[in-house]
């Protein structure tokens, strides 16, 4: 379902987004 797709996208995006946020903090 849609949630499954969003979950898959999140798993691919988060590893890239988290380090960027960490650098800004």
Swiss-Prot record:
One of its GO terms (biological process) is defense response to Gram-negative bacterium. Its main location: secreted. It is found in: Secreted. The modification Leucine amide is found at residue 25. Pfam families: Caerin_1 (PF07440). Expressed by the skin dorsal glands. Belongs to the frog skin active peptide (FSAP) family. Caerin subfamily. One of its GO terms (cellular component) is extracellular region. Antibacterial peptide with wide spectrum of activity. InterPro entries: Caerin_1 (IPR010000). Keywords: Amidation, Amphibian defense peptide, Antibiotic, Antimicrobial, Secreted. It comes from the Eukaryota. This is Caerin-1.10.
């Amino acid at each position: 379902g849609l949630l499954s797709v969003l979950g898959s996208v999140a798993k691919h995006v988060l590893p890239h987004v988290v380090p960027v946020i960490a650098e800004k903090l």
